[in-house]
């Protein structure tokens, strides 16, 4: 009750209570008002304590891994800059330290161009050989353990390996029962350091994912049954060992468990979050999957599922078709560094776009 209302109320009461021999009615009325104010203060304090208790509970649950606090970062990244000087770039990878960016080019001299973290070129990679034109680098990945650089080559049908200084080390030519006839394309490393490779050799029935360990020429195992994939391109492996494959000609993102069993997928379509021609795939440190949809001229972003059988939830997409900043003309590869900076090869615009949250 406002002070003015209390004053008006008191004016209607007698100053003395004749029945009590001098007890002040005014004093009694003030005491009631003070009690009301005290009760309001106590109620406010209790409300504050309840809010603090809820906040503390949320923090405890987040630290225990039961229920993460909501992210304060924006839903989608924004355009930062572009790296120019590469002929129709296809694949991109970033070293674990973030100080080297590797970009494959599919035209011109067909080099793997090496940039520092600021986007300045510091070198190139090219396999040895007499015929300088007989090589076509496509995808690239960097070992999280050795920082060696792995490059798939469509013409040589192998994976070229370089050390961090750029020295050529060897070629991986899949051999043995599983590796015979393989044609390497997409590359990624798993949490245990194994190399994952999409294989597009032969007919569609032979397209699959091969897993190599320790630089061996012979695959440890294959993922996917006959006919499961149709020209699988880029792929990424999450911390649990689940594999996300850009199954390009099938127009879907296929998600496999570590044993190679198909769990769920995002299909081709025209609805929100549907795909058309997925190529590059990357996973960041915040539980998000990024899929380059080449003919849609966008990068789609999804929330990783808790189980491989669940379909990733669609967050949104970034990029549009065009030649301006933040626009794509047939993007292909994607990589994310340790701080969350995103690199996308913008093939027909001859550049690598840089995005971040």
Describe the role of every protein-language-model region.
Residues 67-86:
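A short helix->beta-strand "capping" segment at the edge of beta-propeller domains
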Residues 78-84, 121-131, 168-177, 218-225, ...:
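A short beta-strand motif characteristic of beta-propeller blades
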Residues 85-97, 130-145, 177-194, 226-240, ...:
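Beta-rich, blade/repeat-based domains predominating
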Residues 100-102, 148-150, 194-196, 242-244, ...:
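Conserved beta-propeller blade signature
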Residues 106-107, 154, 200-202, 248, ...:
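Short loop/turn segments immediately following the C-termini of beta-strands
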Residues 110-113, 157-161, 207-211, 252-255, ...:
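A short loop-to-beta-strand structural motif that recurs across blades of beta-propeller domains
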Residues 116-120, 163-167, 213-217, 257-261, ...:
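Short loop/turn segments that connect beta-strands within beta-propeller blades
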Residues 329-357:
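Blade-level signature of beta-propeller repeat domains, shared across WD40, Kelch, NHL, RCC1
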């Amino acid at each position: 009750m406002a002070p003015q209302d209390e004053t008006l109320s008191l004016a209607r009461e007698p100053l003395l209570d004749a029945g009590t021999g001098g007890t002040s009615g005014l004093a009694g009325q003030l005491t009631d008002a003070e009690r009301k104010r005290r009760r309001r203060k106590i109620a406010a304090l209790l409300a504050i304590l309840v809010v603090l208790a809820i906040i503390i509970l949320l923090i405890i649950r987040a630290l225990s891994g039961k229920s993460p606090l909501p992210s304060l970062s924006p839903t989608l990244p924004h355009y930062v800059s572009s790296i120019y000087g590469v002929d129709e770039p296809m694949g991109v990878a970033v070293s674990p330290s973030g100080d080297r960016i590797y970009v494959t080019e599919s035209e011109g001299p067909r080099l793997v161009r090496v940039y520092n973290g600021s986007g300045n070129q510091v070198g190139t990679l090219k396999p040895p050989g007499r015929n300088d034109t007989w090589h076509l680098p496509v995808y690239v990945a960097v070992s999280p353990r050795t920082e060696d650089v792995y490059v798939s080559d469509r013409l040589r049908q192998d994976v070229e390996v370089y050390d961090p200084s750029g020295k050529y080390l060897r070629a991986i030519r899949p051999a043995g029962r599983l590796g015979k006839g393989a044609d390497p394309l997409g590359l990624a490393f798993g949490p245990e350091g194994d190399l994952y490779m999409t294989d597009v050799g032969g007919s569609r029935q032979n397209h699959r994912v091969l897993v190599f360990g320790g630089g061996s020429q012979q695959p440890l195992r294959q993922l996917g049954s006959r006919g499961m994939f149709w020209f699988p391109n880029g792929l990424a492996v999450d911390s649990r060992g689940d594999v996300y494959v850009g199954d390009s000609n099938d127009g879907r993102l296929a998600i496999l468990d570590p044993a190679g069993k198909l769990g769920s997928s995002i299909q081709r379509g025209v609805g929100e979050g549907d795909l058309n021609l997925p190529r590059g795939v990357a996973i960041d440190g915040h539980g998000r999957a990024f899929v380059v949809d080449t003919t849609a001229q966008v990068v789609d972003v999804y929330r990783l599922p808790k189980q491989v059988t669940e379909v990733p939830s669609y967050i949104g997409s970034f990029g549009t078709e065009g030649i301006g900043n933040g626009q794509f003309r047939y993007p292909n590869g994607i990589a994310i560094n340790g701080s969350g900076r995103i690199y996308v090869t913008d093939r027909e615009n001859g550049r690598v776009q840089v995005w971040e949250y």
